[in-house]
Amino acid sequence: MNLSNHFLVAMPDMEDAFFSQSVVYICKHDEDGALGIAINKPSPITMDMIFSATGKNIPFRMQHDSVMMGGPVQVERGYVVHTPIGNWQSSIGVSDNIALTSSRDVIENISREGAVDKILISIGYSSWGKGQLERELADNAWLTVPADEHILFDIPYEHRYAAAFAKLGIDPLALFSGAGHA
């Protein structure tokens, strides 16, 4: 099972302070573990603040967009999920059209026409060690669904959790992750 380019959708009763009601975009999943970016947890940082620090112009449409809190790992670093893949210093291809980049060159070129089409910037990322995500899935902590670019880039972050459940065709209020006992 490879969950790269999938969403993890937290079960409604997840109690973890960070991951409660999270949608995590899985960028890499292999036998060594998984890496993802939470796409619906805003940080206090805006895109305008990021671009002001680089001295580059930000496309007006992104000016007030929130930077996501991608996860609790390496929160001092920025990560960019974007289309198209492009040719950046430190990127991993997630799908045929989406990449995760951690190098500054992608930020410095966003204002350049055609450098990136769609973008989600986060600070930090989410990580699971070998077998950890599989155990959490077996424990019914998460649901999975193939990623959807519309949810990832176009839907406001505060609606992404509901949109991921809608893609699954499930009402989150009807779910309970605990096993039944007779």
Curated annotation (Swiss-Prot):
* CC per GO annotation: cytosol
Q: What is this protein called?
A: UPF0301 protein NMA1550
Instruction: Please report a single Pfam family linked to this protein.
Output: DUF179
PANTHER family, sorted: UNCHARACTERIZED PROTEIN YQGE, UPF0301 PROTEIN YQGE
Give the family per the record: Belongs to the UPF0301 (AlgH) family.
The coiled-coil segments of this chain are: none
TM segment ranges? none
Superkingdom per UniProt: Bacteria
